[in-house]
Structure formats: C-alpha cells, structure tokens
UniProtKB/Swiss-Prot annotation:
The lineage of its organism: Eukaryota, Fungi, Dikarya, Ascomycota, Pezizomycotina. Belongs to the peroxisomal membrane protein PXMP2/4 family. One of its GO terms (cellular component) is cytoplasm. It comes from the Eukaryota. This is Protein sym1. InterPro entries: Mpv17_PMP22. It is found in: Mitochondrion inner membrane. It comes from Aspergillus fumigatus (strain ATCC MYA-4609 / CBS 101355 / FGSC A1100 / Af293) (Neosartorya fumigata). Pfam families: Mpv17_PMP22. It is a multi-pass membrane protein. The keyword Transmembrane applies. May be involved in cellular response to stress. Required to maintain mitochondrial DNA (mtDNA) integrity and stability.
C-alpha cells in the first residue's frame, strides 16, 4: 500500500496529496462529531463532514454541490503542497538548523495565520453564515491554539521528513487538529465549547 502511495506521489503529487487531505479532514470532523460531541450516527451532520473534506482537498460526496471529482482539489491540500515546495526552494540558510527554524517561522507567521482565516472564511461561505461573526468569534482562539501545537510539530516535520512526505505527515497529525478546527468552526452554531 505504501509503495502504491509513493508511486502516486511521484505520478500525481497534487491530486494524491489533495485527496489524502480531503479524507483526513473528513476523519477529523467525524472524530469531532462522534468522539467529542457524541452525536451518534443518526445525528451525524454529513454536510458538515462534506464541507470539511471539500476544504481539505477535494469533492468527497455527499456534498451539496455536484462537481466532478478530478476538477475540484479545493483549498488546503493543494496550497500546503505548493507551500512546502516554496519553503524548500526559498529558505536555505547557512546551517541546517537555521534553515529548519526559518521554515518553521515562515510557516507559523505567514501560512498558519492565513490558512486559519481561509478555513474559517471558507466554512462561513459554504455554510451561508456571517463571515465577520465567524472570524471575530473563532480566529484568535484557533490561531493561539495553533501556536501551542504546530511550531514543535513542524520543527520535527521540516527537520526529519523528506519533502514528498511532509503534507502526508501534516495530514496524519492534522486528524486531531482538524477535530479542533471543526469544533472551533461550529462554536456558536450549536452548543460546542471551544477549548484552546
């Protein structure tokens, strides 16, 4: 299975990483709904899971908009793939340690704040809700939570993981983070507490 995935990464890196991201965003939301919110299968919000998968990297049915799977590689998966390539090309400092720290700093000061805003904005648009209300309510708590977890994880990722596996590594680590993002996104829309 891993060899098949490696081949897919070489042959179709953007599509492979985007679909992987979509699946794992859906897993994170399902975990939020089932393990944290304890909704049960009958009360599972399938459209919410679909929105998370769509944002993560692709159109995973059921989703209210009928778009061809191969034409939709939504937001996070494609951007993260390109972002890691840019960091690899552009941030090369005199020592390996400085290079890793520089990449983590760029990731956490540029990409993370932007992507949290893009996530909350995307969810607001897909839900038909108030963008300003969602950003005001959830942006800062989500960003602070990000900064308590991701700098260390990205330090390990940039130091030890080869470029072609960095998005996969982030995706696996993202299962818990996506659970948090899903809860953060739904604060106020239901009685979902946001803990950061």
């Amino acid at each position: 299975m891993f060899q098949w995935y490696q081949r897919s990464l070489i042959q179709r890196p953007l599509l492979t990483q985007s679909l992987t991201t979509a699946c794992l965003f859906a897993v994170g939301d399902s975990l939020a709904q089932q393990a944290v919110e304890k909704r049960g299968i009958a009360q599972h919000d399938v459209a919410r899971t679909g929105r998370m998968a769509f944002y993560g990297g692709g159109n995973v049915q059921p989703f209210p908009y009928k778009l061809p799977l191969l034409t939709v590689v939504a937001v996070f998966g494609p951007l993260a793939t390109k972002w890691f390539q840019v960091l690899q090309r552009r941030i090369n400092l005199p020592s390996a340690q400085r290079t890793v720290v520089g990449r983590v700093a760029a990731d956490q000061l540029l990409f993370a704040p932007t992507m949290i805003g893009v996530f909350l904005s995307s969810m607001s648009v897909l839900e038909g809700g108030s963008l300003s209300e969602k950003l005001e309510r959830s942006y800062w708590p989500a960003l602070k939570a990000n900064w308590t977890v991701w700098p260390f994880l990205q330090l390990v990722n940039f130091a030890l993981v080869p470029l072609q596996f960095r998005v996969l590594t982030v995706n696996v680590l993202n299962i818990g983070w996506n659970c948090f993002l899903s809860l953060s996104n739904n604060v106020g829309s239901q009685d979902v507490p946001l803990v950061a």
